[in-house]
């Protein structure tokens, strides 16, 4: 597949912004090039390419540094990809609801036509339906979410989809660290049209730091670096992230605690009469079907406990994030009180 042919013409011809300091190699020097204040704690612009962080990520993920892009959250990753590949009012995006709502929001911002094919009853890709659709339409990009938000399950037939789709494919793996399914990272060399998006917001506990990752072939990464804003990851956030990357064992321990808490929550929810279904999950949340999602959601707010009402996407469902054990015990206690009032 010729990836270059999928790049928008204006992006191909883009001359990216280059700071004077990008020509300087080293850490020490008298910097009089960027009109910075010579005083202050964070008076210098951060490394626009986050080289130290990418080196650590490359070691952790076992992937070359030139295959890595860092964005201001995964939303920037997705937005940059749309700006590289999708021509406004001309190209189209294929998504598979129920899924993460920002895909549609970003497509609308970028004036991109959206095609939707619903996941099947098991929340898997309906390959035959997709195949029939692709006989008549050819979206330029597709986004798959695995594990999927809000359903929680991993998509089992991604390879089958890649065999029939001729375009750019983004696999959103925001929740992959909680899954028994392996990341698609090891298959990148086989699929030059695939970009994998991951995040530090979930398993790494750094949602407030706002750093997302993209992994792709170097051609795509080069275009992403050209299109992004020059200093998209602030220096304090780079420092926090680098410190966290120095201690991946701590993250693994926290993931294990979350998985144990997830098992606890599922076992307790199974005892509640009005919980009609607990969907299988590979994420740090559980989707449940209840008798009256709107009523239960409002009752929980009184305690106050905030869950996510997904009734608009999947009838009578609530998405519950796996919190601390003490928080989940409080949730179960109040749920039992709601049970008495139903």
Predicted features along the sequence, with ranges:
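PLP-dependent enzyme catalytic core of the Aspartate aminotransferase-like
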Residues: 302-303, 314-342
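Active-site phosphate-binding strand-loop segment of PLP-dependent enzymes
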Residues: 121-179
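Conserved PLP-binding catalytic core of the aspartate aminotransferase-like
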Residues: 258-259, 272-303
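Short hydrophobic/aromatic beta-strand micro-patches
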Residues: 215, 287-289, 321-323
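Phosphate-binding glycine-rich loop
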Residues: 54-92, 110
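PLP-dependent aminotransferase class I/II
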Residues: 193-271, 277-278
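N-terminal "arm"/small-domain region of PLP-dependent enzymes with the aminotransferase-like
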Residues: 1-59, 137-138, 342
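PLP-dependent aminotransferase-like
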Residues: 51, 87-144
């Amino acid at each position: 597949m010729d990836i270059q042919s999928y790049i928008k013409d204006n992006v191909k011809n883009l001359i990216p912004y280059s700071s004077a300091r990008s020509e300087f190699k080293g850490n020490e020097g008298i910097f009089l090039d960027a009109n910075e204040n010579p005083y202050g704690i964070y008076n210098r612009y951060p490394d626009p390419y986050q080289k130290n962080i990418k080196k650590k990520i490359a070691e952790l993920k076992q992937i070359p540094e030139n295959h890595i892009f860092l964005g201001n959250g995964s939303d920037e990753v997705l937005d940059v990809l749309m700006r590289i590949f999708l021509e406004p009012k001309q190209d189209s995006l294929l998504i598979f609801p129920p899924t993460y709502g920002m895909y549609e929001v970003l497509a609308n911002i970028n004036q991109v036509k959206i095609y939707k094919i619903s996941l099947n009853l098991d929340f898997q890709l309906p390959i035959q339906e997709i195949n029939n659709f692709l006989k008549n339409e050819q979206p330029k990009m597709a986004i798959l979410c695995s594990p999927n938000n809000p359903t929680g399950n991993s998509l089992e037939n991604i390879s089958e989809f890649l065999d029939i789709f001729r375009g750019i494919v983004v696999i959103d793996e925001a929740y992959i660290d909680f899954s028994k399914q392996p990341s698609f990272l090891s298959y990148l060399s086989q699929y030059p049209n695939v970009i994998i998006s991951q995040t530090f917001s979930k398993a790494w506990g750094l949602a407030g730091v706002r750093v997302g990752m993209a992994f792709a072939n170097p051609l795509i990464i080069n275009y992403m670096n050209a299109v992004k804003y020059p200093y998209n990851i602030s220096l304090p956030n780079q420092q926090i992230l680098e410190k966290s990357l120095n201690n991946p064992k701590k993250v693994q321990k926290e993931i294990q605690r979350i998985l144990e808490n997830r098992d606890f929550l599922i076992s307790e929810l199974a005892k509640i009469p009005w919980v009609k279904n607990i969907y299988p999950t590979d994420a740090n949340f559980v989707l449940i079907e209840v008798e009256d999602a709107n009523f239960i959601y409002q009752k929980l707010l009184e305690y106050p406990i905030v869950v996510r009402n997904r009734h608009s996407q999947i009838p009578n469902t609530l998405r519950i994030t796996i919190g601390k054990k003490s928080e989940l015990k409080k949730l179960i206690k109040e749920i039992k009180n709601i049970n008495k009032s139903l």
